Swiss-Prot record:
It is found in: Cytoplasm. This is Phosphopantetheine adenylyltransferase. GO terms for biological process: coenzyme A biosynthetic process. Keywords: ATP-binding, Coenzyme A biosynthesis, Cytoplasm, Magnesium, Nucleotide-binding, Nucleotidyltransferase, Transferase. It comes from the Bacteria. Reversibly transfers an adenylyl group from ATP to 4'-phosphopantetheine, yielding dephospho-CoA (dPCoA) and pyrophosphate. Its cofactor is Mg(2+). Substrate binds at S8, K40, T72, R86. It comes from Synechococcus sp. (strain CC9605).
Length: 163
């Protein structure tokens, strides 16, 4: 099976990585689809995020990393995905994701959405939390892959040089 895992991944977290690794084991192939959303101001460009994900997943066979804009269902159809994969950290995630899953199903009735719960050790992680911790000089080494930590530290150290 081929799963599409869409998201902004700004930045990729260890929670994302855990989901990707588990999904490869379950489904065989995972297309990580990096959303290009011009209305948001990401910390990293789409190309930088793609490179971060490719570097972090290079030990996994069956992972493809792409960018997309527009509807997730169109991306899933274009890339021959059998399902859309979504991670859940809390009940509030489920309520939002279920609404999106129903919308996607109304647009492509043969496309399933599969929800995977995050592992407990990653349940607090979000890209926003990681950026906030990095912005104020906190340790993010346990939150993101090493190459992403380097990129974030470089980004925020250059944005806020010490006096």
């Amino acid at each position: 099976m081929r799963a599409l895992y869409p998201g902004s991944f700004d930045p990729l977290t260890n929670g994302h990585m855990d989901l990707i690794e588990r999904a490869v084991s379950l489904f065989g192939e995972v297309v990580v689809a990096v959303l290009s959303n011009p209305s948001k101001r990401p910390a990293f460009s789409v190309d930088e995020r793609i490179e971060q994900i490719r570097t972090a997943t290079c030990h996994l066979s069956g992972v493809e990393v792409i960018s997309f804009d527009g509807l997730t269902v169109n991306c899933a159809v274009t890339h021959r995905a059998d399902l859309i994969l979504r991670g859940l950290r809390a009940m509030s995630d489920f309520e939002y994701e279920l609404q999106i899953a129903h919308t996607n199903r109304s647009l492509a009735d043969d496309l399933e959405t599969v929800f995977m719960a995050t592992t407990a050790r990653h349940s607090f992680l979000s890209s926003s939390v990681v950026k906030e911790v990095a912005r104020f000089g906190g340790s993010i080494d346990h939150m993101v892959p090493p190459e992403v930590a380097k990129d974030l530290n470089r980004l925020f150290n250059s944005a806020f040089p010490s006096s």
